[in-house]
């Protein structure tokens, strides 16, 4: 399982996302021969969290980063959230590859505030995500 590489576009597109606020979210996948993580989709700043969830496939694993904006008693907050999406319908080998490569991609994506691992849409409830981020970010 070792040896999965990150396509150069992964860090380039992520840096545009983080530094230039060019996108609302990015979804990453493995290439066809499962040897490299590649950018699958970037979403315009007008995209919503619902769009992000809808772009995650039902039977294939993905990584994602989402620019989360939310309110606290202290005011508005913005955090970059990393998602590991391994739905119940995806193959065991794919789940293992994505889990094994998670540390590699997280290391390349500097500035992540929180990590969410989900296997079904119920685990992607926005209110629950915000609550988790608030507890992590104190």
Feature locations, PLM:
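Long, low-complexity regulatory segments enriched in Ser/Thr/Pro/Gly and acidic residues
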Residues: 1-138
